[in-house]
């Protein structure tokens, strides 16, 4: 704990007696959708199928290609394609679609995902992280994207763990990039709800958030202060010109709060 931030670390010894040796286990069928280079020098992003039956794997491969191309079309990934590999893993489910508790619909799927996380209809996650990693056995993997075979809007991004998003909703492309920003980059949400301030306790206004793209101005110098033009006021007023030009500034509203977070 440095006073400004805290970090937790846990050392894993590969020789630990309680770690099962799975080097002889066969890897699931998989395909490189984008190969930037050698696995030892690249970040390997594995894309898993969730809620796709064996007969729907071809559809999954098409969806995974869409996700890969969309992510790599945005900076900073666009300029660093040679540092990433994207690998689609054919992980079939017994049932098609995913579990929807609010409809009392429970399905047997590869990682057991479900909507209604934290009782939010759109929040789609899975607590079966062990299942995800079992599916990647003997496949290079530093990060996970899970595509859900449903047209219902939803998803979630868990920092340093996985992105999970629905593949057949019209907003699939922007949502998979958004959730990847959470899971891979640790970015906070840059939006808020007009009706109410949700999750008021999620961010203390007396401290600087750990997410790199939101601030309470407590320690803004540690964030993107060096990217703001000296002629731009802080906080920054929203204008049509700034919106059109994507002017870097400090705009109020973020982390689900309309006031106090920028």
Give residue spans per PLM region.
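Extracellular/periplasmic catalytic domains that process cell-envelope and extracellular macromolecules
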Residues: 37-41, 78-81, 136-141, 158, ...
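Active-site-proximal segments of metallohydrolase catalytic domains
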Residues: 83-160
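Short pre-active-site segment immediately N-terminal to the catalytic Zn-binding motif
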Residues: 57-60, 155-179
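Solvent-exposed loop/turn segments at secondary-structure junctions
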Residues: 51-54, 92-96, 150-154, 170-172, ...
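Fold-level signature of zinc-dependent metallopeptidase catalytic domains
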Residues: 22-73, 88-98
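Short beta-strand elements
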Residues: 2-32
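Catalytic Zn2+-binding segment of zinc metalloproteases
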Residues: 180-196
């Amino acid at each position: 704990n440095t006073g400004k931030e805290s970090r937790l670390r846990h050392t894993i010894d590969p020789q630990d007696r309680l770690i099962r040796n799975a080097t002889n286990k066969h890897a699931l069928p998989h395909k490189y959708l984008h190969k930037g280079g050698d696995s030892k020098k690249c970040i390997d992003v594995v894309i898993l199928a969730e809620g796709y039956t064996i007969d729907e794997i071809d559809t999954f491969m098409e969806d995974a290609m869409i996700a890969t191309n969309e992510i790599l079309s945005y900076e900073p990934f666009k300029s660093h394609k040679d540092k990433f590999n994207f690998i689609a893993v054919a992980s079939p489910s017994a049932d098609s679609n995913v579990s929807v508790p609010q409809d009392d619909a429970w399905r047997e799927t590869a990682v057991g995902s479900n909507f209604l996380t934290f009782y939010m209809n759109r929040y789609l996650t899975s607590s079966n992280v062990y299942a995800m990693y079992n599916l990647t056995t003997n496949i290079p993997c530093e990060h996970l994207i899970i595509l859900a075979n449903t047209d219902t809007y939803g998803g979630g991004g868990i920092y340093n763990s996985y992105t999970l998003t629905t593949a057949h909703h019209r907003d699939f492309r922007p949502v998979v990039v958004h959730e990847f920003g959470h899971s891979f980059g640790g970015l906070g949400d840059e939006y808020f709800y007009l009706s109410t301030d949700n999750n008021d306790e999620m961010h203390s206004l007396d401290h600087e958030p750990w997410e790199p793209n939101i601030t309470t101005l407590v320690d803004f110098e540690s964030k993107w202060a060096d990217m703001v033009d000296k002629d731009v006021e802080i906080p920054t007023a929203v204008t049509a010109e700034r919106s059109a030009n994507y002017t870097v500034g400090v705009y109020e509203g973020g982390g689900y709060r309309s006031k106090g977070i920028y």
